[in-house]
Amino acid sequence: MSSFTHFNDQGRAKMVDISDKKATVRTAIACSSIVVTKEIYDKISHNEIGKGDVLAVAQIAGIMAAKRTSDIIPMCHPLLLKGVDVSFDWKQSDEQYRLLIEVKVKTEGSTGVEMEALTAASATALTVYDMCKAVDKGMIIGETYLLEKTGGKSGDYTRKS
């Protein structure tokens, strides 16, 4: 494992200088999920949540979060993103309804987009919670994790199952 690079000679936090790094195509895929009741699942599926189309709003929130990651994660560089795609898939078992969230982010630049993908996945799940909390506050936001990344000096990464 490499050493931490976000500290200066005095041991204080710094933003890493990436000006000498080569610009390459970089991608990241992050996942999250939220478990909801059958009632919420039905209301989302039939667009009956009072605040509006939950998945459309959550999708936009995820895209906005990816674009604004450097505003909330202190050491992230502002990036010109080339694309952000938020997708959903429902998984049901018994009376448990899990909304799976997958976010793909792409750029061509000097640093990766892992944090943008992770931030987007988190914000997407949080937005679903916010829009549905009037129906039930017992929703559970699941694990948020990096599934895959490509490009950059550290090479490609794929999460092992």
Curated annotation (Swiss-Prot):
Binding-site list for substrate: M75, C76, H77, M115, E116
Active site location: D130
Pathway: Cofactor biosynthesis; molybdopterin biosynthesis
EC number, UniProt record: 4.6.1.17
Swiss-Prot/TrEMBL catalytic activity: (8S)-3',8-cyclo-7,8-dihydroguanosine 5'-triphosphate = cyclic pyranopterin phosphate + diphosphate
Domain of life: Bacteria
Pfam families documented for this protein: MoaC
UniProt cross-references to InterPro entries, sorted A to Z: MoaC, MoaC_bact/euk, MoaC_sf, MoCo_biosynth_MoaA/MoaC, Mopterin_CF_biosynth-C_dom
Keywords in alphabetical order: Lyase, Molybdenum cofactor biosynthesis
Protein's GO biological process: Mo-molybdopterin cofactor biosynthetic process
Keyword hit for Lyase: yes
Annotated GO MF terms: cyclic pyranopterin monophosphate synthase activity
HAMAP family in alphabetical order: MoaC_B (MF_01224_B)
Annotated family: Belongs to the MoaC family.
Known function: Catalyzes the conversion of (8S)-3',8-cyclo-7,8-dihydroguanosine 5'-triphosphate to cyclic pyranopterin monophosphate (cPMP).
Quaternary data: Homohexamer; trimer of dimers.
Protein name: Cyclic pyranopterin monophosphate synthase
Species of origin: Bacillus anthracis
Underlying gene: moaC
